[in-house]
Swiss-Prot record:
Annotated organism of origin: Oryza sativa subsp. indica
Domain Tify: 65-100
Domain of life assignment: Eukaryota
Name of the molecule in the record: Protein TIFY 11d
Quaternary context: Interacts with BHLH148 and COI1A. Interacts with COI1A, COI1B and COI2 in a coronatine-dependent manner. Coronatine is an analog of jasmonoyl isoleucine (JA-Ile).
Primary role: Repressor of jasmonate (JA) responses. May act on an initial response of JA-regulated gene expression toward drought tolerance as part of a BHLH148-TIFY11D/JAZ12-COI1A complex.
PTM (free text): Ubiquitinated. Increase in jasmonoyl isoleucine (JA-Ile) levels mediates its degradation via COI1A-mediated proteasome pathway.
Keyword Ubl conjugation: yes
Entry's free-text remark on domains: The jas domain (117-142) is required for interaction with COI1.
Localization annotation: Nucleus
Broad class of where this protein is predominantly found: nucleus
The encoding gene: TI11D
One cellular component term from this protein's GO annotations in UniProt: nucleus
Length: 171
C-alpha cells in the first residue's frame, strides 16, 4: 500500500511541476531559420577558433539547444519524467530545492556492513569446528550408547504353537 501511495504522490508532484513550468514560461517570439543560423554562427565564431576546418564543419551540423531553455529529466522512485523547455534559472532552483530537502537518516551501523560477511564467516568456522569435534568424538553414537548401558538379555520361554514354527518368536 505504501508503494502505491508514494507513486501517486510522485505523479501528482510531477503534474504540479509541469503545470508550474507551463505557467511560468514566458512566451517567446518566433525566430526565423535565417536569424537562428546567423545567431548561431556569431556565437560559434566568438567562442572558438576554426583550427581544424573538417572538424568544425562536422560540428556545424550538430543542433544545439537554445541557451535559455532545455529539457529537464527527473529520475525519482524508479520513474523518469521529462519536462521540455525549462529555463536555466528554474532548473537551478529545482536543484537547490532537491539538495536542501531532508534525506532519510543514514543508519549508524552502515560502517559495520563490510565487516558483517567476515563476522559471519568466523562464526561459521567456529560452528563447523565444534561440529567436526563432536563428530570425531562420537563417531558411532548408537554403538556407544549401547555399550554404555548394556541391556540385560531377555530370555523368554515361549511355548511354540503346534501349527506355527517357533523360530520367529525367539526375540
Amino acid at each position: 500500500m505504501a508503494a502505491a501511495g508514494s507513486s501517486s504522490r510522485f505523479a501528482v508532484t510531477c503534474g504540479l511541476l509541469s503545470q508550474y513550468m507551463r505557467e511560468r514560461q514566458q512566451p517567446q517570439p518566433p525566430v526565423t531559420v535565417l536569424e537562428a543560423v546567423a545567431e548561431e554562427e556569431e556565437e560559434e565564431d566568438a567562442r572558438t577558433m576554426q583550427l581544424f576546418p573538417p572538424r568544425a564543419a562536422a560540428a556545424d551540423g550538430v543542433a544545439t539547444p537554445s541557451a535559455g531553455t532545455a529539457p529537464l529529466t527527473i529520475f525519482y522512485d524508479g520513474r523518469m519524467v521529462v519536462v521540455d523547455d525549462v529555463p536555466a534559472e528554474k532548473a537551478a532552483e529545482l536543484m537547490r530545492l532537491a539538495g536542501s530537502a531532508c534525506s532519510p537518516p543514514q543508519p549508524a551501523h552502515a560502517a559495520a556492513l563490510p565487516e558483517m560477511p567476515i563476522a559471519r564467516k568466523a562464526s561459521l568456522q567456529r560452528f563447523l569446528q565444534k561440529r567436526k569435534h563432536r563428530i570425531t568424538t562420537t563417531s558411532e553414537p548408537y554403538k556407544k550408547a549401547a555399550v554404555a548401558s548394556p541391556a540385560p538379555e531377555k530370555s523368554f520361554a515361549v511355548a511354540p504353537v503346534k501349527d506355527e514354527p517357533a523360530t520367529w518368536l525367539g526375540l
